[in-house]
Regions:
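His/Asp/Glu-enriched, well-ordered alpha-helical/loop segment
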Residues: 1-89
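C-terminal cap of metal-dependent C-N hydrolases
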Residues: 67, 80-129
Length: 129
């Protein structure tokens, strides 16, 4: 199912709600062909609004897709012997009480090597959570 569907809370074409499908256990992975950032946003929305653990929600965009395409032995979980592709994510509150938050990628590692470092946490706007 599409991660943007999770963000919107419904399908833009009137099809199955991804949130409902995940909650019922009929959707086991998320994708996005036009808004890749939706993958991280959807994980946090499912955790916050659908009472999924972060590990369950992240499996929808990591382990489960890796299994589906036959590369689970190489990627998809942090396991000895697998490639270490890691994102460090920080939730930034958009309101003082942090009721509305957005996930921000602060570091990215590919194959265990640092490939991205954000300076966003040093910026004075937003409310850290």
């Amino acid at each position: 199912a599409g991660a943007p569907n999770v963000m919107m809370g419904h399908s833009h074409s009137g099809n199955l709600s991804a949130r409902e499908g995940v909650a019922r256990g009929v959707i086991t992975m998320l994708c996005s062909d036009y808004y890749p950032a939706a993958l991280i946003d959807a994980v946090f929305i499912l955790h916050r609004e659908c009472a999924m653990s972060l590990s369950e929600a992240f499996a929808l965009v990591t382990a489960n897709p890796a299994k589906a395409v036959g590369i689970y032995s190489e990627v998809g979980t942090l396991t000895v012997g697998k490639r270490a592709d890691i994102l460090l994510v920080r939730e930034i509150g958009c309101t003082p009480d942090a009721r509305i938050t957005t996930p921000v990628i602060t570091r990215a590692f590919v194959g265990g090597n640092s490939v991205y470092r954000s300076h966003y946490p040093d910026q004075p706007h937003g409310y850290d959570r």
